Amino acid sequence: MWIGVISLFPEMFKAITEFGVTGRAVKHNLLKVECWNPRNFTFDKHKTVDDRPYGGGPGMLMMVQPLRDAIHTAKAAAGEGAKVIYLSPQGRKLDQGGVTELAQNQKLILVCGRYEGIDERLIQTEIDEEWSIGDYVLTGGELPAMTLIDAVARFIPGVLGKQASAEEDSFADGLLDCPHYTRPEVLEGLTVPPVLMSGHHEEIRKWRLKQSLQRTWLRRPELLEGLALTDEQRKLLKEAQAEHNS
């Protein structure tokens, strides 16, 4: 997978390209991340990349010409088929379904805004989609872009040790993840649930599903509203609710 990034702070993306799972993906040529800095497309000695908004008001906007030229350069490097995404509080909120959609693309160009944002005409002419990571404001689009890259990269074949890891993560089936345990067997008086040490794989599967349903019901009940639960899931959820309320 190829991802191009337009950012005034490309150095920030070393966190993605040099560390952890995504760093290994880059090292093994499963993921390629290229960055373009709009400052490198300026023509004045100060490398100006911000400009005043028409109509006045606080703050500045990213200057059109350097940003536009950076986007065009990234598009040329990507070739055909690249989807251009602007990270914006006004965008569609990123969730696991959205991550799965974006992971189907082999080429993405991520535009990271700064200041008060970018000219609306650039959004109309250069941007394919706007995405947000939540209903709050950050100082720039770099952290949302890194979040998106990390989430999408998990679906690239070979990036995770087991592809099942991505398929069984929280939200992969619309539910929160179940609790997990490792050694020691007893920690400050708290023990590992016996079923997890039983060796009965079917019982372990049912326990994990039941815990996942219960955790979603207790912590994020709105997630259940849009799910078409199976007969087994409905049965296990009723059991979990009865146990919790008893």
Swiss-Prot record:
It catalyses: guanosine(37) in tRNA + S-adenosyl-L-methionine = N(1)-methylguanosine(37) in tRNA + S-adenosyl-L-homocysteine + H(+). The keyword Repeat does not apply. Keywords: Cytoplasm, Methyltransferase, S-adenosyl-L-methionine, Transferase, tRNA processing. Its main location: cytoplasm. Pfam families: tRNA_m1G_MT. Its EC number is 2.1.1.228. It comes from the Bacteria. Specifically methylates guanosine-37 in various tRNAs. This is tRNA (guanine-N(1)-)-methyltransferase. It comes from Haemophilus influenzae (strain PittEE).
